[in-house]
Amino acid sequence: MPDETNFTIEDIEPRPDALRGLDTQFLQDNTALVQAYRGLDWSDISSLTQMVDVIEQTVVKYGNPNDSIKLALETILWQILRKYPLLFGFWKRFATIEYQLFGLKKSIAVLATSVKWFPTSLELWCDYLNVLCVNNPNETDFIRNNFEIAKDLIGKQFLSHPFWDKFIEFEVGQKNWHNVQRIYEYIIEVPLHQYARFFTSYKKFLNEKNLKTTRNIDIVLRKTQTTVNEIWQFESKIKQPFFNLGQVLNDDLENWSRYLKFVTDPSKSLDKEFVMSVFDRCLIPCLYHENTWMMYIKWLTKKNISDEVVVDIYQKANTFLPLDFKTLRYDFLRFLKRKYRSNNTLFNNIFNETVSRYLKIWPNDILLMTEYLCMLKRHSFKNSLDQSPKEILEKQTSFTKILETSITNYINNQIDAKVHLQTLINDKNLSIVVVELIKTTWLVLKNNMQTRKYFNLYQKNILIKNSVPFWLTYYKFEKSNVNFTKLNKFIRELGVEIYLPTTVMNDILTDYKTFYLTHSNIVTYESSIIDSNTFDPILYPELKMSNPKYDPVLNTTANVDWHKKTEWKEAGHIGITTERPQISNSIIECNSGTLIQKPISLPNFRNLEKINQVKINDLYTEEFLKEGK
């Protein structure tokens, strides 16, 4: 157990099984605790509440349990609150339980942790500050510092009058009249529910202390009163201001939406801190609503709020939003790239940490590796116009070496944990790193020979063999070299040895037909059909559309005895076979190129005797349908 004097709730061991290590007899005697924990439904507030109820009952039952039991109970509560830190009622109950188990210091430590994990909770701040004032009255500077922190976090909330009452009470107790006046001067501009009471108290305070103010507070009163009257139409309709695991009521969502549109209206010219306070309050019940987070970030960006604040909001959204919300998370990456120039090191580090976190969530998302490689090149291998060509070449060569080493180490299962790129590569995004290596070698270093070596090397790897980016890059490379031999081979292998999505293959086939007609000539065409009697670079792509496994060689071989197949004889009528007369040496399906080499022979026929065969007795027509002959 950690030392009580330096205790914070984060010191509790984050083990997955809180009941591990407990005495068997204790577990048998407390089946309610075991069942509640083992059957805990993390998505049901009733189940979580029942768990805390059982913990409280256990504390009452044992009074002063041993350290193992205390740790187990603390761990369960910490698991709940780490997952749902906005359950302010659970923090209060946790503080009470800690007081019963350990005493005042740990109880205060829990409250201190609560305002760290839920900094916009008015209730938790009031509880924490009240406990500090009552139990640590001599720590004036520490208490005042916490009041100032709370003022910035919850002081602009519409119902924050209990906090301001406590703050004024504290400074009055210290007889610091200057600070009392400073607080009143701040409050009278804040649209609070009980604004009028504070104006009255301020005037009384000025008269009693014979103090002057530098402005007409009646004018300030009218302005504040107007703002309060305008926002009351929204404040009065808020039914659920707290966080819950259930869905937010539609009426509340619509009311919050109208409220946010009102406070962000430029024509209202409301105080920025007040608008931020409204957003913070809205995001308590609407924690899982991506649109609200996006609206908040958009407003912060428009108002030129510091990048640190915007990053903090993005990171909070990353923490709380369900994992299937990608829009905001990818928007965060774009924001970091936009702001990169303002602080290269800071934003690069945040970018790397964010990509690492996203790849753990979505390991199959190859776009993340693409974004990471762009930032890696921009940060560690950037070029500028004032650099010499030699310096630029050296940097780009170094970049390719880093890529090649990372690829080789991953394939050989020799990952270097010190190289961040190598820790991010997985089976799905390996091809993206390979493609980046190939593109840099081909387009930047202009080394076609090495590029072809990379293609030949990596196309054999099972993790890359069916990669769309890899083969599209290969296709573009061969097109740039107008290498019809390689291209024809590639087109033939599509769907046979190279398996890509049908839509991708169709796009390639369509593009290749156009490319061939544009860049080829009659000599090239004749040589290709003579070299391969079964491959026509103009007709073949058309025949292969939406039929990836089409192979003229296989089809030619199969056509030798095609007339003997049951499918042909049945002609769609299963069980009824006919042998129709037909030409056995038809020229329709022959390669037209062979017709000029020898004269066309006369047609030969098979099954001619079938012309005069006896008509089948159609019992179905005659007897069932009752039709005459």
Swiss-Prot record:
Task: Note the superkingdom of the native organism.
Answer: Eukaryota
What organism is recorded for this protein?
Saccharomyces cerevisiae (strain ATCC 204508 / S288c) (Baker's yeast)
GO CC field: commitment complex; nucleus; spliceosomal complex; U1 snRNP; U2-type prespliceosome
* Compartments where found: Nucleus
Hey, which family's this protein in? Belongs to the PRP39 family.
Which named protein is this? Pre-mRNA-processing factor 39
Task: State any GO BP term from the record.
Answer: mRNA 5'-splice site recognition
Q: Give the UniProt keywords, A-Z.
A: mRNA processing, mRNA splicing, Nucleus, Repeat
Function per UniProt: Function prior to stable branch point recognition by the U1 snRNP particle to facilitate or stabilize the U1 snRNP/5'-splice site interaction. Has a direct role in the assembly or function of a catalytically active spliceosome.
Q: Chief location of this protein?
A: nucleus
Q: Which InterPro entries match?
A: HAT, TPR-like_helical_dom_sf
Could you share any additional remarks the record makes about this protein? Answer: Present with 4460 molecules/cell in log phase SD medium.
Q: Which residue intervals correspond to the HAT repeats?
A: 68-100, 102-134, 138-173, 175-208, 233-265, 270-302, 446-480
Q: A single Pfam family, by name?
A: HAT_PRP39_N
Question: Would the keyword Transport be found if you checked this record's keyword annotation?
Answer: no
Organism lineage reads as: Eukaryota, Fungi, Dikarya, Ascomycota, Saccharomycotina
According to the record, the segments passing through the membrane are none
